[in-house]
Amino acid sequence: NYLISKKLVKQFYTPYSCSEETLKRAHSENYIKHIKNKTLDQNTIKKIGFPLVDSVVRRSLVATGGTVLASKLAINYGIACNTAGGSHHANFEGGAGYCVFNDVAVATHYLLDRGLAGRILIVDLDVHQGNGSADIFKNNKNVFTFSMHSKTNYPVKKSISDLDVE
C-alpha cells in the first residue's frame, strides 16, 4: 500500500459491524430494529435519502463500527481516523441527510461509558451543520459540540450546538 510504503501510516485496520448494544446509546431501540429489519417507514427512508437495502444497512453498521474502532485506536496511539465516518445528521429517533447512524455520537458514548474519556469535543467542519450530534448531546455536560457550517445550507432548520459558527 502506498501510504504504508511512504511511512505515512503504520497500519490499516478492518472495521467490524457495530453491535446493537453500542448503537443503543445514541439511537432508539425501535429505530435500530427497523433499520436492521428493513421495516422503516417511507417518510424516514426519504429523509435519509438512501433506499433501505442490505448493502446500506451493512455499510452503516460497519462505518459506525469503524468510528468506534478509530476512537479506541486514537486513545491507544494518539491519532486515528475512519474515512467512512461523519454521519452527523442522524439523531436519536432517526436518520436524515444520507446518514443512517450517527457514528460520531455512538463512538462518543462508547468512550464516555467505558471511562476512556471524561469530556469530549466534537469538531464538525462540514458545510452542513452537525444537527444530529447537536441534538443527541444537547443536555450532556461531558460533550461539547462545535459546528462550523454554511448558514444557508442543509439542514434548513438548524439545531443548537454548544458553539455554531455560520
Tell where the protein language model's regions lie, with residue ranges:
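HDAC/HDAC-like amidohydrolase catalytic core signature
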Residues: 1-166
